[in-house]
Amino acid sequence: MGKASITNLLPRGRDHDLRRGLGSELRRRRLAAKLSQDEAIGPLTRAYLSQVECGRTMPSLAALIVLAEQLGTSADEILRGVNIALNSEYSPGHENR
């Protein structure tokens, strides 16, 4: 049996929402900290951060931890922000895209 991607465990469409939400949350926090992409990447590349912020790439846990540290927060705080955003997006009365 092949390796399963964690995003394959999500309902159809939610993997894109998770990538997009995580990228948006990271970008929001980076801008709030008044950091450029170059200042926020640590050992990562600016191209990688751009891909993550645009929702095209799901960061690994290690990359998420590095980015969180660069932003002066923790990975769980970032994920909490994404969870809140996703829950409000999928809540009754909110029109899903």
Model-derived regions, located:
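Short, conserved catalytic or interaction motifs in soluble domains
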Residues: 54
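Short alpha-helical DNA-recognition segment
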Residues: 31-51
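Localized chelating/binding microdomains
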Residues: 38, 67, 97
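Helix-turn-helix DNA-binding elements, focusing on the entry/boundary residues of the two helices
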Residues: 26, 37, 46, 61-64
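A short, Lys/Arg-rich alpha-helix, primarily the initiator
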Residues: 2-32
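Short, charged recognition helix plus adjacent turn
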Residues: 2-8, 16, 79-97
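DNA major-groove recognition helix of helix-turn-helix/homeodomain DNA-binding modules
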Residues: 2, 60-78
